[in-house]
Structures are given as C-alpha cells and as structure tokens.
Design a protein with these regions (language model features):
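Metal-dependent amide/peptide-bond hydrolase catalytic core
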Residues: 1-151
Length: 151
C-alpha cells in the first residue's frame, strides 16, 4: 500500500461562484475522507482560467448584425461550452462575446470533434468568419453601422 496518493483534475463551470463552491466542496470532502481514515489531505487549486461569460447585450447586438450581413447563417442561441480561454479575462474587464463559427463538413470528412486526433476544419468557413468579425467591429466603430442600419 503506497504511503501517499496524488489526485489531479480540472474544475470548470459557467459561473465563478460555482467554481468557488466546487473548490470548497473538493477541499472539504477530501479532508473529511482523509480524517475518517486517519490520514491527512492537502488540496491545492490552481485556477488556470475563469469561466467565459458573454454579455447579453453584446450577444443580441451581434446577433442582429450577423443576421443582417449573413441572413442564411444559422445562429444557435442555446449552445454552451466550458471553454478554457484567455478570452475569459477580457470578458471580465470589458463587455463582449465569444462565439464559434462552425466548419464541420461531413462530405469532406471534416467533422471530428476538436480534441480528436483527426480533427481538421474546412477552410471554406474562413470567409464567413472574417465577414462576421468585420461586421462586429464595424457595428461599433463605423457611424450608422448599428444593427438596424447594416446593409
């Protein structure tokens, strides 16, 4: 029987309060199980990133912009992912939104998940991504380019 054990994992959530609660619970459960067995537990939490939290107002603004510049594009409102991104730090400081431009293309065999060894993306999605990003910026910096005026 080994004298010590090491467990490692990742804690992710959609809200910072939930991450704090999970950290507290992991610590309490670990220490109490160890104490019940006559051992000690040391819990170290290294937070790598914050949750990515989009601003609802920015989301709605960009939704209108994207529908105006690319009316045929499918906008999925309910998609959630526990992305671990540097973007979370920007969104904590400034209202913004983090969005994906899908590129799956089953006809070309380009529909594997991001962490799959055969993942690749269809470069044909790049022009749409550029168009959406340019329209997003334009809606904030060009006079008259607000969503109800984008052509």
């Amino acid at each position: 029987i080994p004298a010590s054990a090491r467990l490692r994992g990742t804690i992710r959530a959609f809200r910072s309060e939930v991450i704090a609660l999970l950290e507290e619970r992991v610590r309490a459960i670990s220490e109490n199980i160890a104490a019940a067995l006559g051992c000690t537990a040391e819990v170290t939490v290294e937070q790598v990133t914050l949750p990515v939290v989009n601003d609802a107002g920015v989301n709605e603004r960009l939704r209108a912009v994207f529908q105006a510049v690319a009316p045929g594009v499918q906008l999925i409102r309910s998609f959630q992912t526990m992305a671990a991104e540097d973007m979370s730090y920007f969104l904590e400081a400034v209202p913004g939104t983090f969005f994906f431009v899908g590129s799956a293309n089953p006809e070309c065999g380009l529909d594997y998940a991001h962490h799959h060894p055969r993942f690749d993306f269809d470069e044909a999605a790049i022009p749409l991504a550029v168009e959406l990003l340019a329209a997003a910026v334009a809606s904030y910096v060009l006079p008259g380019a607000q969503p109800d005026h984008v052509e």
